[in-house]
Structures are given as structure tokens and as C-alpha cells.
Amino acid sequence: MRIGVPAETRAGETRVAMTPETAKKLKAQGHTLLVQSGAGLAASVTDAAYEAVGVEISDAAGALSCELVLKVSAPSAEELKHMKSGAALVGMLNPFDAEGLAQLAGAGLTSFALEAAPRTTRAQSMDVLSSQANIAGYKAVMVAADKYQRFFPMLMTAAGTVKAARVVILGVGVAGLQAIATAKRLGAVIEASDVRPSVKEQVESLGGKFIDVPYETAEEKEAAEGVGGYARPMPASWLERQKVEVAKRVAMADVVISTALIPGRAAPVLVTEDMVKSMKPGSVIVDIAAGKAADGVGGNCLLTEAGKTVVKHGVTLVGETNLPALVAADASSLYARNVLDFLKLVITKEGEFKVDMEDDIVAACLMTQGGDV
């Protein structure tokens, strides 16, 4: 079949949905591949690198008019005009964006949102949320180290001793764990907080200290266990106690990295304005949840501004909304492998596209088909 990969048009998006590595494997299966000229340049992939593995270089209309289109983010209204009714689309389409899904259905597309894949062992190799969150956690620490005006590691020099940076990480999912590991490698002293008690061992195994908040009721304990690897909203009583403990650590922190997200819900507020005021001048907050708050601007920190780096009360707040795009080459490589593994479920050995609703991963990812959401 004809598989097209257009250049991403969303502002700041540098990733590409297919690399020469995955293109070579798809080509070996007999597919015709079209990539828009320049689609991979921001991810350090030239048109020549694609051509070397048998990919045809095309314009945007050519790539978008294929039977199967691979993208990173959802297509714009302009891109949808070039897509054929009945075509298939695979990408990170945001399964909670009802308006966006309605547009895809209106265009007659069979679309799959990879973020909706179940958190099962079988689906691990196509888990785009984990592969990209891993990169976000790493880059958040690197960005923080760049903005922070002191060293991360402790140094003992002839001119005196420099203290290690104190880093507090809020939310210990994939991004949080990678942030702990990266900050530890840079020599920081790390504390981490999460609502799930099961992550305490993981935090300590990476060299961090877990900020423990005991549970006082069965309801609190049950909510803390989470579902499908994600946290659930916690009772107000526990959140108040956690806020007190976290506030103490944030006041002493040099760097705060917040990663707390709940699928389909607004990002919880973990850092208030008073907490920012309590921090030392020159401290840094990197908010991975920027733009995911109820207002679409903030994140885990009440003062975060999505897409901007601002200084408030002497604290630098980084609101970068697409950290994986700052590591475009590796982010694209991992994402393209996720896509390739998903395609094995919807393309038969004969090279035909087939939607198998008996497959739990395919059924979970299918967002629109035959004009219906």
C-alpha cells in the first residue's frame, strides 16, 4: 500500500513519524513510501537518507493523499483537505479532543490515536506516551541545569566547596523516573513525591529520597494505587497533607521538576504562588505539564505560562510544552519504532490494511471509522 509521511506543521514540532530505519523495514514488505521533502530535516534526517532506502520524496499533497498517513500530531484543517475519504491515519491524535476527532470523522478517515494503547505488556513496544515521556524527563533536567545559575554536583576546589543542587521531582511516572536518574547523574540531591506508594522503591533505587505522606483512610489508600499505571484523583484530606510536606521541600529546593498528569483530566496544581514565593532567588521550575491545566495555560505550577520561560518572584519558570521535540532525532527514532510496531497489527502479511476489532490494542486506539467517532 501507499504510505505517506508529511512534514509536521504544528508550531515547534520537530519530530517525524518515520525514519530511514523504519522505512527500510516497511519497504521490505513491499509498500510504496512517500515522504514530504524536508519532513525529517529538524530531526537530522535528510531527503537523501530517505531516498537511500527507497523512499520517494514528495510534496505535502502527495504524502497526505496516500492510503495510510503517518503523523506525529493531528492534522490541521488545511492538511485534512488533501486527505482522501477512507484513508487511514496513525499518530498522537489526542483521544480526549472531541472536536478534533469529529473533524477526522467528518473527513471520512479511519484514525488511530496511539496514546490510547492499553498499558499492557503486549502494547509496551508501541507505547508512545512512555517513549516520549522518557525523553521529556531527561530534557527537563537538562533545561533546568541550563537555566540554573549554579552547579548541580558538589565540588570541592582550592577556592572552596560548592554545595550540590537540591532537586524536587513531583510525579514519579516515566518522565519523573528519568528526571531522577538524569539529575542523579549530574550529582544533584533528589527528593521525589507521588501519590502512589508503590513508586517509593523505584525512587530509592535511582538514588532519590521519597517524600512520604501516610494514608489515614481506606479510601486514600485505594485511590493511591492508581489504575493502568496512572494516578487517580486523590481525596482532598490527603492532598492537603501532601501539600504541606511538598511545600516544605519546595521552599528548600534549587530546582523543581513537575511531571504530574492524569489522562483526560486537567493537570493537578501542585505548586502554588505562595510556594513559588518561598523559593530562593535563582531557583528554577520546569513544568512538564505546561498547557495542560484547566485554563490551557498553566500546569502543575499555578504561575506557569505555556510556551514561555518567565521569571516570577525571582524564580525562573519554564513552560515548554513539547520537550521531546527538543531532542528531535532520538524522539523521532523511538516514535517511529512505536508506529512500526503498531502497523504490524493493522497491516496483514499480504500487505493489506485490516482493522481487527478482536485485537484489544487496535480496538483501544481506533478513534474514527466510516464517519463515526
Where are these regions (language model features)?
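An N-terminal-biased, well-structured beta-alpha scaffold segment characteristic
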Residues: 4-103, 107
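Generic hydrophobic/aromatic pocket-lining and core-packing "Φ" positions
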Residues: 23, 47, 80, 101, ...
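ADP-ribose/adenylate-binding Rossmann-like module
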Residues: 83-115, 255-318
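Adenosine-phosphate binding glycine-rich loop
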Residues: 115, 121-158, 289-290, 294-373
